[in-house]
């Protein structure tokens, strides 16, 4: 029986490499998968899933208007699994499509993404994945400033933390760092340096 999985983590927790590893494991057994990613993520190139260690794969870019259910339903032969990167950028309708893929097509769906934004609010896609997923798993990493588990993302501009602004501002380690709750509220000023 297929299930909807949401695997979330902060920036730099290894979500993209994990999705590429899952795809490899399926394909090594001769089981095709479908890779999807958000059209919004243009850090590397639209339509690619890229890890910080240099691995990358082509993926179908999805947007707010994409009917993911119809896209998957039209694929023949059916994939063994649907894998989605940057799932925080999904809409409510996109997530409902994922649930339909699981329930009506009996295809497992694994979505990977951030849970909360730099202001500590849930992304729309993450909110509905938390509500509808059968299994939810945290991908862990450590705080930039200490050894605690990182659970939040701190947006940086010119070495200073930023707590206001638009929710979606595409960027990598030069713009965001993963931190624990303590250091989200009180980042150590003497250790804040612009990331390269």
UniProtKB/Swiss-Prot annotation:
Residues in coiled coil: none
Reaction catalyzed: thymidine + ATP = dTMP + ADP + H(+)
Pfam families from the UniProt entry: TK (PF00265)
EC number: 2.7.1.21
Keywords carried by this UniProt record: ATP-binding, Cytoplasm, DNA synthesis, Kinase, Metal-binding, Nucleotide-binding, Transferase, Zinc
Enzyme class: transferase
Catalytic residues in the record: 86
Binding sites annotated in the UniProt record for Zn(2+): 143, 146, 180, 183
Annotated residues for binding of ATP: 9-16, 85-88
Domain of life: Bacteria
Cellular component, GO, one term: cytosol
Molecular-function GO terms, alphabetical: ATP binding; thymidine kinase activity; zinc ion binding
Compartment(s): Cytoplasm
Quaternary structure and partners: Homotetramer.
HAMAP family with a match to the protein in the record: Thymidine_kinase
NCBIfam families: PRK04296.1-4, PRK04296.1-5
Membership in a protein family: Belongs to the thymidine kinase family.
Protein name: Thymidine kinase
Gene that produces this protein: tdk
């Amino acid at each position: 029986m297929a299930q909807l999985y949401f695997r979330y983590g902060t920036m730099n927790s290894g979500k993209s490499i994990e999705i590429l590893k899952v795809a490899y494991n399926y394909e090594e057994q001769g089981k095709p998968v479908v890779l999807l990613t958000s059209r919004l993520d243009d850090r590397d190139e639209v339509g690619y899933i890229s890890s910080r260690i240099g691995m990358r794969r082509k993926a179908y870019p999805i947007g707010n208007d994409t009917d993911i259910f119809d896209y998957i339903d039209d694929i023949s032969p059916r994939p063994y699994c649907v894998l989605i990167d940057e799932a925080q950028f999904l809409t409510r309708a996109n997530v409902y499509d994922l649930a339909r893929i699981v329930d009506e097509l009996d295809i497992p769906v694994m979505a990977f993404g951030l849970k909360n934004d730099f202001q500590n609010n849930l992304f729309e896609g993450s909110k509905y994945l938390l509500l509808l997923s059968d299994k939810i798993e945290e991908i862990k990493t450590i705080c930039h400033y200490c050894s605690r588990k990182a659970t939040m993302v701190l947006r940086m501009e010119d070495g200073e933390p930023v707590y206001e602004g638009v929710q979606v501002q595409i960027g990598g380690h030069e713009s965001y760092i993963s931190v624990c709750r303590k250091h989200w509220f009180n980042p150590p000023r003497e250790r804040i340096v612009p990331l390269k």
